[in-house]
Amino acid sequence: MQSRLISIAASEGFTFHHAERNESTLTLWLKDGPSKLPGYATHQVGVAGAVLDEDNGKVLVVQDRNKTVNAWKFPGGLSDQGEDIGATAVREVLEETGIHSEFKSLLSIRQQHNHPGAFGKSDLYIICRLKPLSYTINFCHQECLKCEWMDLQELAYCSNTTIITSRVAKLLLYGYNEGFHLVDLTMRTFPAVYSGLFYSLYHKELPETYEGSATLL
C-alpha cells in the first residue's frame, strides 16, 4: 500500500493488521460485533541442534558472544520463513560451528511468552537431534566465544549451562544409553488438504501394526 493512503484508510476505520518489509496491511471488519479476523504472527521460532557423535558420546556446544552469561548451549538461531525445523538446525549449526550435520529427530519444544527478543510476542525454542557429518570445528568468532566437543555426561550435569540445555542433555543421554526411540519425535511429510501443499508431522514412531493408509487432516 502507498503510505499516503494510510491516513485516508485510518480515517475510515481501518487499523493496522501487520507490516512486513515494504508492505502494510490494514483491515476493517464490516459485520456487526468485534472483528473475527485472525491475528498475524504470534510466535517466532528458534531452533538449536544437539549434534551427538555416537562413536564417543561427545556433543557439540558453543558459548554465545552476545549473552550476559557465558553458558554452554547447543548452537542454533531463528528459523527463516518457509524453512523446515530440521533444515534450520542444520543450517545454524553449520553457520556457527562449521560442522556439517544431518537431521535425525525433534527432542523438545519450549514456549515462552513475552519474550524480550521477540518484540513482545511469544517464542518457540525447538531442539533437534543431529548426526555429525564432519568433525573439524571452524566456529564463527562474531557469534561465538567458544565451541567444542564436550562429553555428553559432563554437559548433562555441568553447572555452567542453562536449565533447558542441561535437561535436554539428560534426555539425550537417556536416549544414547537406552535407545533413541524412547526420546525421538521423528518427522514425516504428508499431503495437506490444500491442493499442492504438504506438511511435516513430528511424532513418536508408530509400530508397523498400527501403520496404515493416511487420512488427510
From Swiss-Prot:
Cell compartments where the protein resides: Cytoplasm; Nucleus; Mitochondrion
Transmembrane stretches, start-end: none
Family, per entry: Belongs to the Nudix hydrolase family.
Tissue expression profile of the protein: Detected in liver (at protein level).
Protein name in UniProt: Nucleoside diphosphate-linked moiety X motif 6
Alphabetical UniProt keywords: Cytoplasm, Hydrolase, Mitochondrion, Nucleus
Nudix hydrolase domain segment(s): 42-177
Pfam families, per database record: NUDIX, Nudix_hydro
Known EC number: 3.6.1.-
Family annotation (InterPro entries): NUDIX_hydrolase-like_dom_sf, Nudix_hydrolase6-like, NUDIX_hydrolase_CS, NUDIX_hydrolase_dom, Pre-Nudix
SUPFAM superfamilies (alphabetical): Nudix
CDD domains in the record: NUDIX_ASFGF2_Nudt6
Class of this enzyme: hydrolase
PANTHER family with a match to the protein in the record: NUCLEOSIDE DIPHOSPHATE-LINKED MOIETY X MOTIF 6, NUDIX HYDROLASE RELATED
Further information: This protein is coded from a FGF2 (BFGF) gene antisense transcript.
GO CC, any one term: mitochondrion
Motif Nudix box in this chain: 77-98
UniProt superkingdom: Eukaryota
